[in-house]
Structures are given as structure tokens and as C-alpha cells.
Amino acid sequence: VRNRISIRKLLAIVLAALAVSVVVLNWTYGRLPAEPKPTGSFAEVGKLRIHYGEHPGGGGGAPVVLIHGLPGTTGDWEDVAPLLAGHRTIAIDRPGFGYSGGGYVPFAEQLQALHELFAELHIVHPILVGHSYGGTISLGYAERYPGQARGLVLVDAAAGGQHGGGYERAQAHFVKFMQLPVIRQIANATFGQLLTTVSVNQREDEAFHPEAVVAVHHRRVLAINMTRGNLEAYAGEMLAANGVVAQIDRRLTSIQTPAIVIQGNADELVKPARGRRLAATLPHARLEMLYGGHMQPYSHPAAIAAAVGALSAAKTSTAG
């Protein structure tokens, strides 16, 4: 009996020590950085407040709108925007992400918000540059508003048969649950920050592979994309993504807007076959297969800028 009691006490001590260790790690290694203040501007679009950064440009090229993925912020284009000096360039925080409010905003409502934002900012016939799910948004906009976009640069776009699996959906459900007010408060005080940091580290490694993770991007994801509103938007989009991508894929042949598909040949999130299929299905598209993973805005900003230049200089007879 004494041995059993001793074993129970020992187990209790071990479990208590583990619990304390997790809490300590939660507030040391796992502690999330403070959210920095926004540096861009805001536009009121319906019930949404959209954050954007503008680079005026002066070369007379077509206006350019940079649309981040899932998740993301305007900062994802920090290496691309300076290369577009000949264009008025606007990088947006999609509704629900970055500093744009709204939590989860459904796909169709995002397209409407983009259209209204363009009117508000006097953006006419822009070239849309969409990364990952931002590419899906760009395709959706071109399909819903034919003739409004001059061209599309689709960077590792979530299309061409892209389909998330059970793990991604389970993760999204878990993230959604963890944003419940009381749950989030308890988790953040005990283990939530540690779990978030470990999860982000793993996802970042996968996204940047075979290149190294860019430190400034990693910190920005932790500081901005891990806030409650951003995570609500992330979970909602992840759960809706399969249906949205399937819907867009069915309509690809109707999109007459000229497009350049930029695809990483080692992308682990959007496989190269997806990019090939997308480029082959769109009526007026060409494929640029580049070395690298999913984060082409960091690894190949010059290639993205060159694609913008090519679309800006091209005739627009097929745009529509």
C-alpha cells in the first residue's frame, strides 16, 4: 500500500512539474510578440474597415493591387512593392486579416468589398497580384467582374484542383474553438501561446521550404496573424476553402483576363501540378515555373515584378 501511495505521489509531483514547465515555457519561449501599430491607411467599405498600404509610383504603368494569402498581411509584399515604382501600387489586408476588421468574411463578400474599395480609391483596371488564397480571390474577382482587371499574376495560387485534407479542417475547427472568449483567456495564460508558436514554426518551415524562413515574416505572423480576429478569419476561410476553390475551378474557362501563373517547383502547400493545371485551363495564361517553395513573394520578388510589367505592357484585347 505504501508503495502505491509513493508511486501516486511521485506521479502527482511529475505531472505538477510538467504543468509548471509548460506554463513557464508558455510565457518565455512561447510568448507572442506585441502587435505593432499599423503604418498604412484605412478605408471604410460598407461595414468593413480595410487597411492598405499605398506606393504612389510615377511611371504611368497600370495600377497594381497586391493580395496576400491565408493568412497574411500587407507586409508580405515588402520585397515586391519597391520593384513596382512605375505603377501605383496598393497592398491590402484582406477583410479579417492584418489590421482589417471583420473576423471571417465569406468569399463573395470579400469580392464585393474589393470592388467597393477600388471605387473608393479610384483604382481603374488594375493588375491583381494574388499569392496563395489571394490568387483564388483574384480569380474570383476576374470571374465576377469581367473586364475590370487588366491582368492577373497568380503566385502559387490555391486553384487548379487544390484541396485541403482532413488535418487542415480539424486544425481549423480547433482554432475556431480556441477563439471562444473564456477558452482563449485560459489557454493563453497556460499553454496557448506555446502551442501557437510551435504550430507557426512548423507551418512556416513547410511554407518556405526549401528556403530558410524569413525572420521578419515569422515575427509578423506571430504578432498580427495570431490575434483573435485574424484567427477567426483563418479558421473560417480554411473551412470554406475547398468549396470556394472547387467553385472557381469550374469557372476558370470563362475568365478571359490575361494571366501569368508563377509556381514554385518545390511548393509543399500548393503542388506544382496545381499551377500547371491552372495555367493550362485559363484561356489566356502562361506558366512560369520557378525554383523554390510557396513563399515566392520573398524568394522571387523580381519575377513577380517582371510579370506585372509584362501584363502592363501587353495589349488588352483579351481582357474581359
Language model segments and positions:
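Conserved HGGG/HGGXW glycine-rich cap/lid loop of the alpha/beta-hydrolase fold
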Residues: L48, E54-Y99
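Alpha/beta-hydrolase fold catalytic core
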Residues: V1-A62, A85-H87, I123-V124, V308-G309, ...
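Active-site loop/oxyanion-hole signature of alpha/beta-hydrolase fold enzymes
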Residues: G53-P56, A91-Y133, Y145
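Flexible "cap/lid" loop of the alpha/beta hydrolase fold
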Residues: E143, L152-A189
